[in-house]
Swiss-Prot record:
Keyword Nuclease: yes
Function of the molecule: CRISPR (clustered regularly interspaced short palindromic repeat), is an adaptive immune system that provides protection against mobile genetic elements (viruses, transposable elements and conjugative plasmids). CRISPR clusters contain sequences complementary to antecedent mobile elements and target invading nucleic acids. CRISPR clusters are transcribed and processed into CRISPR RNA (crRNA). Functions as a ssRNA-specific endoribonuclease. Involved in the integration of spacer DNA into the CRISPR cassette.
Binding site for Mg(2+): 9
Family assignment from sequence similarity: Belongs to the CRISPR-associated endoribonuclease Cas2 protein family.
Annotated protein name in UniProt: CRISPR-associated endoribonuclease Cas2
Organism: Aeropyrum pernix (strain ATCC 700893 / DSM 11879 / JCM 9820 / NBRC 100138 / K1)
Assembly and binders: Homodimer, forms a heterotetramer with a Cas1 homodimer.
Protein backbone atom coordinates (compact mmCIF):
# COMPACT_ATOMS: atom_id res chain seq x y z
CA UNK A 1 0.00 0.00 0.00
CA UNK A 2 1.26 3.46 -0.91
CA UNK A 3 -0.04 6.91 -0.03
CA UNK A 4 -0.11 10.28 -1.70
CA UNK A 5 0.85 13.22 0.49
CA UNK A 6 0.17 16.74 -0.77
CA UNK A 7 1.23 20.10 0.62
CA UNK A 8 0.55 23.39 -1.11
CA UNK A 9 0.80 27.13 -0.63
CA UNK A 10 -1.75 28.87 -2.85
CA UNK A 11 -1.95 32.61 -2.18
CA UNK A 12 -5.40 33.32 -3.64
CA UNK A 13 -8.13 32.57 -1.07
CA UNK A 14 -10.80 31.38 -3.52
CA UNK A 15 -8.35 29.18 -5.43
CA UNK A 16 -7.05 27.74 -2.15
CA UNK A 17 -10.62 26.87 -1.14
CA UNK A 18 -11.23 25.23 -4.54
CA UNK A 19 -8.03 23.22 -4.11
CA UNK A 20 -9.19 21.95 -0.72
CA UNK A 21 -12.63 21.04 -2.05
CA UNK A 22 -11.13 19.21 -5.05
CA UNK A 23 -8.77 17.13 -2.91
CA UNK A 24 -11.59 16.18 -0.51
CA UNK A 25 -13.74 15.15 -3.51
CA UNK A 26 -10.85 12.98 -4.69
CA UNK A 27 -10.81 11.10 -1.38
CA UNK A 28 -8.00 12.92 0.40
CA UNK A 29 -8.13 13.49 4.15
CA UNK A 30 -7.05 16.81 5.57
CA UNK A 31 -3.98 16.62 7.81
CA UNK A 32 -3.53 20.37 8.23
CA UNK A 33 -4.95 23.40 6.43
CA UNK A 34 -2.99 22.80 3.22
CA UNK A 35 -1.72 19.25 3.75
CA UNK A 36 -3.68 16.18 2.57
CA UNK A 37 -3.15 12.42 2.42
CA UNK A 38 -4.89 9.56 0.61
CA UNK A 39 -4.33 5.92 -0.20
CA UNK A 40 -3.19 5.72 -3.79
CA UNK A 41 -0.24 5.69 -6.12
CA UNK A 42 1.31 7.51 -9.05
CA UNK A 43 -1.90 7.90 -11.03
CA UNK A 44 -3.70 9.57 -8.12
CA UNK A 45 -0.63 11.75 -7.49
CA UNK A 46 -0.56 12.89 -11.12
CA UNK A 47 -4.31 13.53 -11.20
CA UNK A 48 -4.16 15.60 -8.00
CA UNK A 49 -1.09 17.51 -9.19
CA UNK A 50 -2.78 18.42 -12.47
CA UNK A 51 -5.90 19.59 -10.64
CA UNK A 52 -3.87 21.80 -8.30
CA UNK A 53 -1.64 23.04 -11.11
CA UNK A 54 -4.71 24.43 -12.90
CA UNK A 55 -5.49 26.54 -9.81
CA UNK A 56 -1.98 27.68 -8.93
CA UNK A 57 -0.09 30.77 -10.02
CA UNK A 58 3.24 29.35 -11.20
CA UNK A 59 5.01 32.59 -10.30
CA UNK A 60 4.25 32.55 -6.59
CA UNK A 61 2.37 29.41 -5.50
CA UNK A 62 3.92 26.10 -4.46
CA UNK A 63 2.71 22.50 -4.76
CA UNK A 64 4.43 19.38 -3.44
CA UNK A 65 3.01 15.93 -4.25
CA UNK A 66 4.74 12.85 -2.85
CA UNK A 67 4.07 9.13 -3.22
CA UNK A 68 5.21 7.47 -0.01
CA UNK A 69 5.29 3.83 1.15
CA UNK A 70 2.68 2.68 3.63
CA UNK A 71 5.24 1.71 6.26
CA UNK A 72 6.45 5.32 6.34
CA UNK A 73 2.91 6.44 7.12
CA UNK A 74 2.39 3.74 9.75
CA UNK A 75 5.67 4.71 11.42
CA UNK A 76 4.81 8.42 11.47
CA UNK A 77 4.15 10.32 14.67
CA UNK A 78 1.42 12.88 15.08
CA UNK A 79 -0.51 14.91 17.58
CA UNK A 80 -4.21 15.57 17.33
CA UNK A 81 -5.85 12.16 16.81
CA UNK A 82 -6.54 10.01 13.80
CA UNK A 83 -6.92 11.36 10.29
CA UNK A 84 -10.42 10.59 9.13
CA UNK A 85 -12.06 11.43 5.84
CA UNK A 86 -15.59 10.68 7.02
CA UNK A 87 -15.65 7.10 5.74
CA UNK A 88 -12.49 5.43 6.96
CA UNK A 89 -9.47 6.08 9.09
CA UNK A 90 -6.58 6.79 6.75
CA UNK A 91 -3.80 6.93 9.35
CA UNK A 92 -3.78 6.11 13.04
Amino acid sequence: MVYVLIAYDISNDSKRLKAAQKLLQMGFARVQKSVYIAKGGRSLAKEAYRALQRLADSGKDKIMVMVIPGDSVRDAYGLGGSLEDGKRVVVV
